[in-house]
Structures are given as C-alpha cells and as structure tokens.
Amino acid sequence: AIETQLEEKKFLDFCCEHYQVIKDAGVRIAIESDFEPSRLDHFIRKLPNDVFGINYDIGNSASLGFSHKDEITTYGDLIYNVHVKDRPLGGTTVPLGEGDSNFREVFRSLFLVGYHGDFILQTARAKENNHLDVLLKYKNYTELCITKYFTE
C-alpha cells in the first residue's frame, strides 16, 4: 500500500520510467486501491492511460463507505476491469446481495460511462464445499444485474 507522498512519487516514477517496455510488451496494468475517489482520480491520471488503469472492486468500495456512483462518474473512463464482490460497511466479503454493495448503482453507472471491460467474480467462498453451486448462483446474480441495469 502507498502510504506516503514519497512512496507515491517512487511508484509513479517507476511506472513512467518503464512505460515504454510495458507498452511494447502489450501489457496493461490495472491498479486496485483504497484511496478515496478524488485522490485515486488524481493519482491514476498522472500515468499514461493506455497502459495504466483501475481495477474497480465493488465490495471494497462498499466496505470503505464510498459512493459507487461518485467513484464511477469520477474515473469510470479508466476502469479496466471490475471485481464483483459484496461487503458490508467496514466488514469482510459476504455472499452477493448480503452486504452494502449497491449493484444497481454500480452496473447502471458503468453503463453510463461506456464501460466495456471484464467482470471478475471475486466472491465469498462456499461454506459447505458446494463451490460449483455457489459459483453458479453468483454468476446468475451477476448476469441478472448486467441484464437489468447495464442497459438504456
């Protein structure tokens, strides 16, 4: 985690110094951060956006009490992929729909900013080793959200 201005400067300098190598390799780097939205926006826009972007974690944002709509409106054009996860305010990962993530707001906001990236299920584990059933439930929940809210 970047905690000081010096650490931030070192990270940004490193990324900028290695930008061309990363770009030439065809690699894109998605940064996941717990910075509050305006700080993350200011930070990520210091980097070339054809190589560096944001991995948006729905559950982490809910846990930190951030407004999904405000975040996505602020830097949605730089979101490379989305972790579909649910967490209560200040808590840990829970099954989708049981935390404070506002999936309607997330998917609607992503649609409005023209998001076309991946949705990655980073969900709570099955409690009774019925992993396939639980994953299918999460997949169906996510597809429902996309169908219902990721439209005009």
What is each model feature region?
Residues P37-Y56, N60-E152:
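Histidine-acidic metal/acid-base catalytic patches
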